[in-house]
Amino acid sequence: MTEFQTLRGMVDLLPMQTQRWQIVENLARHHFHRAGLKEIRTPLLEITELFARGIGEATDVVGKEMYTFLDRGDRSCTLRPEGTASVVRSVVQHGLLNQGPQRLWYGGPMFRYERPQAGRQRQFHQMGVEFFGLPSIHADAELISIAWDLLQDLGLKDLKLELNSLGTFEDRQNYHARLNEWLECNFKLLDKDSQDRIHKNPLRILDTKNQSTQELLKDAPLLTDYLSDLSKERFLCLQEALHKLKIPFDLNHNLVRGLDYYCHTAFEITSSQLGAQATVCGGGRYDRLVKQLGGPDTPSIGWAIGMERLIILLEDSIHKEQFVDVYFINRGELPAIEALSLTRKLRAFNIIVELDHSQANFSKQFKRANRSNAKWAIIMGEDEIAKGEIRLKRLTSSINGDGFDEICFRNSEFNELVHTLKN
């Protein structure tokens, strides 16, 4: 074992892994651009109170999972455990809401002190979308459709959209009273975690993963029975919009999400391939959060995708791209200088070139070239310099069937070389 290792739950992404990540990130950016979204980037570190107030003191995230410390100015700081609170803080701080509705996306690392397992790390990555100032139920439908279409375009087949309505704050207050009464009557039948949550965050009991408690909850009062007529109408309109968009969904009356700021729409996109960590994307509406964090009353909705879980699902379907177009083999002082000059010119034409600086014999350099997964090798030694030639050798089989394995270009035939490398 080497002297220095990554911390538990902190994972290095090595070059062959980052290729897969880049494919996903680039496709996501394309979807976001097509949907008229603008990127926002926020710091990894925020004042702890932002998350305590925004996410909720009684949540597991704030109570158990945050990386929190005092800085040298005795301020309590926290590595962001999720993206929404930071985006809201930024939107309020910089007055973006004065410019009208905002349609934003973000991406980057988040931190939670959880037990690491497949698809869940202590440093993890999310990409998310947030709409501000859009109260329409059709904004909810559009937001869900952006996530659904992205996951479909990535080739995921085993997906399920689960949908619920949490109603208004007043709806939930009425429901809390009835739910607490029922939970107290069944206290001894609940699992230990659920018993601990009764007085802290009873709604989270509905989202338990304990099977015996799940069975018990089938007889619990339903939140949907306590929704106001307006909340029920809103939820029906969302379902109709999703039917119109041909996005299939299941109603899950126990879906409450893990953060306190949600209201009305709550949803998750899951995959059975992920086992216990089934959620790929989750989100909902949070109309009170902006005001709660010092901004104006602003209807808002958003979602986040867990990148690690997404990559697990895509490992077999995302194929390795050609990472290098050309591996440049050279030996000798003058060939090395000429090789560097030619490499710069080729890169200016968006040709990916890896230049060998080893000055090893050609046999060893060819072995490296084959390992590089390059399509071509350029060979430049003293003979090529003397003849004024650039020698090109194919390292992979011909796609168009032209049949040549090796060809020489005169130094004056640079354009022909570029054309060959690009085709």
Swiss-Prot record:
Catalytic reactions of this protein: tRNA(His) + L-histidine + ATP = L-histidyl-tRNA(His) + AMP + diphosphate + H(+)
CDD domains in alphabetical order: HisRS-like_core (cd00773), HisRS_anticodon (cd00859)
SUPFAM superfamilies, A to Z: Class II aaRS ABD-related (SSF52954), Class II aaRS and biotin synthetases (SSF55681)
Compartments where located: Cytoplasm
GO CC terms: cytoplasm
Keywords carried by this UniProt record: Aminoacyl-tRNA synthetase, ATP-binding, Cytoplasm, Ligase, Nucleotide-binding, Protein biosynthesis
UniProt keyword Amino-acid biosynthesis, yes or no: no
EC number: 6.1.1.21
Entry-linked InterPro entries: aa-tRNA-synth_II, aa-tRNA-synth_II/BPL/LPL, Anticodon-bd, Anticodon-bd_dom_sf, His-tRNA-ligase, HisRS-like_core, HisRS/HisZ, HisRS_anticodon
Enzyme class, UniProt record, top EC level: ligase
Recorded superkingdom: Bacteria
Keyword Protein biosynthesis attached: yes
GO BP, sorted A to Z: histidyl-tRNA aminoacylation
GO molecular function: ATP binding; histidine-tRNA ligase activity
SUBUNIT field: Homodimer.
NCBIfam families for this protein: hisS
HAMAP family according to UniProt: His_tRNA_synth
Family stated for the protein in its record: Belongs to the class-II aminoacyl-tRNA synthetase family.
Protein name per its UniProtKB record: Histidine--tRNA ligase
